[in-house]
Amino acid sequence: MSIRTEKVASLLQQELGAILEKELPRSSALSTVVDVKVTADLGIARIYVSVIGTEEQRTAIMAWLHDETKYLRKLLSAKIRHHFRRIPEIEFFEDRIYERASRIEQLLREVRKAPEQHD
């Protein structure tokens, strides 16, 4: 990734995080913009969102993001239009890295306990 695309990705992550904090429907689930990948031509931004909550909450939030993509892009445009001639199209993807990390930690704890049980 070039320095330009990294800067764009960082700005998009920051601004979208702020937008989602205000715009996401209130629920007990925690949502975070984890990463943003921007194509070399700056035409598409892939937004990776982590949702910590029940499966139902994750599904609902991801569905809302997909349904409201145009609206969210419009809000983003209003915030960053002075930085760009053209605002990238945005695509949302769910990132379950925290869920996977939690599962790995759980497995490691079980492995550490296993030798103690055999003594």
Swiss-Prot record:
Q: Which InterPro entries match?
A: KH_dom-like_a/b (IPR015946), RbfA (IPR000238), RbfA_dom_sf (IPR023799)
One GO biological-process annotation of the entry reads: maturation of SSU-rRNA
Q: What is its main location?
A: cytoplasm
What start and end residues bound the annotated signal peptide?
none
GO CC annotation terms, alphabetical: cytosol
Extract the GO molecular function terms from the UniProt entry: ribosomal small subunit binding
Keywords per UniProt: Cytoplasm, Ribosome biogenesis
Which Pfam families does this chain map to? Answer: RBFA
Q: How does it assemble?
A: Monomer. Binds 30S ribosomal subunits, but not 50S ribosomal subunits or 70S ribosomes.
The record describes the protein's role as: One of several proteins that assist in the late maturation steps of the functional core of the 30S ribosomal subunit. Associates with free 30S ribosomal subunits (but not with 30S subunits that are part of 70S ribosomes or polysomes). Required for efficient processing of 16S rRNA. May interact with the 5'-terminal helix region of 16S rRNA.
Name the family. Belongs to the RbfA family.
Q: Which HAMAP family match?
A: RbfA
- State the name under which the record lists this protein: Ribosome-binding factor A
User: In the UniProt record, what gene is named as encoding this protein?
Assistant: rbfA
